[in-house]
UniProtKB/Swiss-Prot annotation:
tRNA processing is among the record's keywords: no
One Pfam family here: PsiA
Keywords assigned: Plasmid
Chain's role: Not yet known.
Keyword Secreted on entry: no
Protein name stated in the entry: Protein PsiA
Family that this chain belongs to: To PsiA protein of plasmid F.
Biological classification of the source: Bacteria, Pseudomonadati, Pseudomonadota, Gammaproteobacteria, Enterobacterales
Species annotation: Escherichia coli
Length: 239
């Protein structure tokens, strides 16, 4: 549906002339007829006032104050600007035409430009949202890889050395994830037996680590030795 058919008010004479110029010139072009130079501009003024040759008086339709001196040497620029204005149905308004020339002949151009801008903005936002989603997914995967690496490294620590593990990962993995890894890991060590997570929930995690490391170092020699040999790398060394 054309912008003309969407109009809610009757078209003025110049608006009707502009749309007739578009229709007639496009028809001649599709029929393969040879078009004169600046065919849309010529058709517009012919439909508007019957002019066969575009004169200063015709161009004053766009700028009433235009003088012969101003037109001299610039006639081609004026005709080209009018031709492009009509051909693009107001989408392109070049100098020396005044800024309101497009809306005078094609009032719907403002709506069309605004809708196109809105559509473009929507596409940009959609692309940005997809990009954000991809980046968020990549960050989540990278973070999960860090958590997995922290879990692997924790397996090679005993309660005596777990403090160094916490120091290494405390600024790279969220504390609640470190806590989960710690409590799962600690279930297999005798020196940590009997520890219940809920009993330590009001204590900062770094303090839990410090106290459990101290308790492990104060445990009996047999317990410490057993826990050291429970660490996988110790088992490999023994082999």
């Amino acid at each position: 549906m054309s912008a003309r058919s969407q109009a809610l008010v009757p078209l003025s004479a110049e608006q009707q002339a502009a749309w007739r110029a578009v229709a007639e010139t496009e028809k001649r072009r599709h029929q393969g007829n040879t078009l004169a130079e600046y065919p849309y501009a010529g058709a517009f003024f012919r439909c508007l006032n019957g002019s066969r040759r575009i004169s200063l008086s015709d161009l004053r339709f766009f700028m009433p104050s235009l003088t012969a001196e101003e037109l001299r040497g610039n006639r081609s620029q004026w005709l080209y600007a009018v031709d492009v204005l009509i051909e693009t149905q107001g989408e392109v308004c070049l100098l020396p035409l005044p800024g309101d020339a497009a809306e005078r002949l094609f009032p719907s151009v403002r709506f069309r430009v605004r809708e196109r801008s809105r559509h473009k903005s929507a596409l940009v936002m959609q692309k940005y949202s997809r990009q954000q989603a991809r980046e968020a997914e990549q960050k989540a995967r990278a973070y999960q890889a860090l958590v997995a690496q922290a879990e692997i490294e924790l397996a090679f620590h005993s309660p005596e050395t777990v403090g160094s593990w916490h120091a290494r990962w405390s600024d790279r993995v969220a504390e609640h994830d470190l806590e989960t890894l710690f409590w799962q890991w600690g279930e297999r060590f005798p020196s940590l037996a009997g520890m219940e997570r809920w009993q330590w929930q009001d204590m900062p995690f770094w303090q839990v680590i410090a106290e459990r490391s101290l308790a492990a170092r104060e445990a009996g020699h047999a317990v410490r030795e057993m826990e050291r040999w429970m660490v996988p790398n110790k088992l490999r060394e023994a082999a």
